[in-house]
Amino acid sequence: MSSGRIVQIIGAVIDVEFPRDQVPNVYEALKVQGAETTLEVQQQLGDGVVRTIAMGSTEGLKRGLDVNSTGKAISVPVGKATLGRIMDVLGNPIDEAGPIGEEEQWEIHRAAPSYAEQAGGNDLLETGIKVIDLVCPFAKGGKVGLFGGAGVGKTVNMMELIRNIAIEHSGYSVFAGVGERTREGNDFYHEMKDSNVLDKVALVYGQMNEPPGNRLRVALTGLTMAEKFRDEGRDVLLFVDNIYRYTLAGTEVSALLGRMPSAVGYQPTLAEEMGVLQERITSTKKGSITSIQAVYVPADDLTDPSPATTFAHLDATVVLSRDIASLGIYPAVDPLDSTSRQLDPNVIGQEHYETARGVQYVLQRYKELKDIIAILGMDELSEDDKLLVARARKIQRFLSQPFFVAEVFTGAPGKYVSLKDTIAGFSGILKGDYDHLPEQAFYMVGGIDEAIEKAKKL
């Protein structure tokens, strides 16, 4: 246990001088004496000086203060004691409910599982959300990205998925709030409490107001807790909101450490940092981690380096569209942009595959006809095209669905729709079984039976 002293403080970056024969390793955690602050070594500058990044506020620190090395990386509580608790990046409880009382602590920097340990599977994970189950089905043990600009519903979709999967799937979940609003973290906690699933969720928060080092590491803290559950032989869910803020924190840290920026000002190590996190989120022969990650898309530009780097790691992408949200269709998932590796007849079956592709074909054709309709009007279309447009508008409305987590705002009770009902409903619309029903009947309902009931009242 070596000790040194602070020689320079620039914002969140602190240089500490140690005796030359006792220089701590990179990623080692240091504690400032007489303060709550934890530092993480990022660089060794030579002459016994290390450059560190602070995990908390640097207010009140000054040169000359003593710093002790802990001899290991940041370690956090793991295991069942973390369930139902809110913790920070260091694993300290922040829910005012006493100490965690864990039996074990793990370091947050760990090696990803080797090729030999990894396991893949094709089991589907039903979400109860029609549009997702139909066009971009999730795999158990897969990685899913929720892409969307500001205010199109990433967090609400994420909360609905957690509620549905936690209640139906009844496994353990870990939620990592990375650089998001404190208000959302609070809403989320109460939503979980009201749904009686809090005792199955471990919450780790590093909110927007935290220093960049904190936001960069909080995703690893949550992941470490999920890895523990996986290694115990469980199927665990890992939710990360928001992966873009993880990248952004990396950009801030990179700039503070004086590295040259790369494209659009991002850190030169963007792909490597993303890989370090994503390669650990994987399923092994012991258990699985199914991860759902919200990805903020800056200025709605999917080609921005941050979302573009994330795409490469995912099995399914759910793209939320501002155009669809502006039509009042929620969840605002774009069925033409969203993709999944599971959308294969050998995995999901022929009927599901043909229905999903049929829905996409009808919507794509409608998109192409919109220009003609705008210029010449509906009357100029052929009879076949008129029928196709009518079905497309029904499909578009039937892709909307009332959410449980939005009941407070909409006043409409939430709906969980099984995969079987989803396929039956869309298959019926495509075949023309419901051509006689008005399109309003399909808006904001659960299964097709509800649409038929609603049509009787119109």
Swiss-Prot record:
It comes from the Bacteria. It catalyses: ATP + H2O + 4 H(+)(in) = ADP + phosphate + 5 H(+)(out). GO terms for molecular function: ATP binding; ATP hydrolysis activity; proton-transporting ATP synthase activity, rotational mechanism. One of its GO terms (cellular component) is proton-transporting ATP synthase complex. InterPro entries: AAA+_ATPase (IPR003593), ATP-synt_VA_C (IPR055190), ATP_synth_F1_bsu (IPR005722), ATPase_a/bsu_AS (IPR020003), ATPase_alpha/beta_chains (IPR050053), ATPase_F1/V1/A1_a/bsu_N (IPR004100), ATPase_F1/V1/A1_a/bsu_N_sf (IPR036121), ATPase_F1/V1/A1_a/bsu_nucl-bd (IPR000194). It holds the Pfam family ATP-synt_ab_N. Its EC number is 7.1.2.2. It is found in: Cell inner membrane. Produces ATP from ADP in the presence of a proton gradient across the membrane. The catalytic sites are hosted primarily by the beta subunits. HAMAP family: ATP_synth_beta_bact. PANTHER family: ATP SYNTHASE, ATP SYNTHASE SUBUNIT BETA, MITOCHONDRIAL. F-type ATPases have 2 components, CF(1) - the catalytic core - and CF(0) - the membrane proton channel. CF(1) has five subunits: alpha(3), beta(3), gamma(1), delta(1), epsilon(1). CF(0) has three main subunits: a(1), b(2) and c(9-12). The alpha and beta chains form an alternating ring which encloses part of the gamma chain. CF(1) is attached to CF(0) by a central stalk formed by the gamma and epsilon chains, while a peripheral stalk is formed by the delta and b chains. Belongs to the ATPase alpha/beta chains family. This is ATP synthase subunit beta. The lineage of its organism: Bacteria, Pseudomonadati, Pseudomonadota, Gammaproteobacteria, Pseudomonadales. The gene is atpD.
